[in-house]
Amino acid sequence: MLVLKRIFQNDKYTIGRLYDSNTYLCDTLEPPKHVNHPCIDNGTYKISYQPSKKFGRNMPFLLNCNGRVGIMIHPGNYPRDTQGCILVGRNITKGSLSHSKGTFDNVNAIIQAILNLNGSVTITVQ
C-alpha cells in the first residue's frame, strides 16, 4: 500500500511525501485545496491503469475520488502541471519538483510490482 503524507500547503501548492509502507519513495506536488482543480480529499483510493491521451500510454489513475475522474499519478514540475493530479519528483526548490520523469518511472515500476504481487494497489492520502 502506498501512503501520501501531505507536509505543507499554501494558496499555490501542496507538498507531500510518498511512501511504500514505511519506505520513502519521493516527494509529491498537488494543487492547493481552494482552486478550480483542488487536491483530492484525504482517503484511500484504488489505483488502476487506464489509457491516457495526454501521455499516450497506460497511466496509474486513482478511482472513486469523490466524484472526480481523471486523477492520476504522473510526472510534472510545477503547480501549473497539475489539475488535481499527484505529481512525483524531488522537492529541492521551493514550490516545485525536479527529476520528475525518472522519479515517475521508479514509482510506476513499484506500483506495477505491487499490482502484480497483490492483484491490486491502493494509495492512502493523509
What annotation goes with each model-predicted range?
Residues 1-121, 126:
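Cell wall/extracellular polymer interaction/catalysis modules
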